[in-house]
Design a protein with these regions (language model features):
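NAD(P)-binding Rossmann-fold cofactor-contacting core
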Residues: 1-5
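Rossmann-fold dinucleotide-binding core
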Residues: 27, 53, 58-138
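Rossmann-fold NAD(P) dinucleotide-binding segment
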Residues: 9-77
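Cationic-aromatic interfacial patches
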Residues: 150
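Small-residue-rich helix-loop
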Residues: 159-172
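Interdomain hinge/lid region at the active-site interface
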Residues: 174-204
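A short glycine-threonine-serine/GTX helix/turn-capping micro-motif
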Residues: 129-140, 187-197
Length: 204
């Protein structure tokens, strides 16, 4: 990556955060997030006063509020900013970003977040970004489950599901999941993108 873009590699989150005006993370879950922030080599040890830390992890609202308070006590700001859009959205810089936190740091961070997003919105105080992401995940889980059941029903009925989706995707059943996931689901290909285990984690 650094062969193509300017930057440097750090051995630890603590090293990476030194002297940064903006800090960004995106890890797997609450435990991972706690380790890279509050752990022995966590970024909270070196984040400078006045800096803004933006976390794109899908985590709990509780840890978001915890990190917000801890950041405030150390003189810098924290925004919980989970993302939606999947691998393709990340690679294309067209993610949706749901933000919780204070308005002043949000306004400062917005132009930076805009580099990898198509929609950014401050949704309320700390934790609001994570709560909004939960709404998002509940909607997606229901849509994917419904699409899976529908494809299975249609295939068992002997229908050409590519033709079926072509038709019904132009009606009230249309969704982003239908448009972007039906081909691989029909072909039984599930070796990329967002893992089911991560969705289970989000819905707990």
């Amino acid at each position: 990556w650094i062969k193509e873009y300017k930057g440097k590699i750090a051995d630890t989150p603590m090293d990476a955060a030194k002297d940064c005006d903006f800090i960004f993370t995106c890890v797997g879950n609450d435990n991972d997030l706690r380790e890279v922030t509050l752990g022995d080599k966590g970024l909270f040890k070196t984040a400078k006063k006045g800096s803004i830390y933006v976390d794109n992890t899908t985590a709990s609202a509780n840890i978001a509020r915890e990190l917000y308070k801890e950041a405030k006590s150390k003189g810098f700001d924290f925004l919980d900013a989970p993302i939606s859009g999947g691998q393709a959205g990340a690679e294309g810089g067209i993610l949706t970003v749901m933000v919780g936190g204070d308005e002043a740091p949000y306004k400062k961070a917005e132009p930076v977040i805009d580099c990898y997003s198509k929609k950014i919105k401050l949704l309320g105080p700390s934790g609001s970004g994570q709560l909004t992401k939960m709404v998002n995940q509940i909607c997606i889980a229901g849509l994917v489950q419904g699409l899976s059941e529908a494809i299975n029903f249609g295939m068992n009925a002997g229908l050409n599901m590519h033709d079926v989706i072509e038709v019904i995707s132009k009606g009230a059943a249309q969704s982003w999941q239908m448009e972007n996931r039906h081909k691989t689901m029909i072909e039984d290909k599930f070796d990329y993108g967002f893992a089911v285990d991560w969705m289970r984690k989000d819905l707990k």
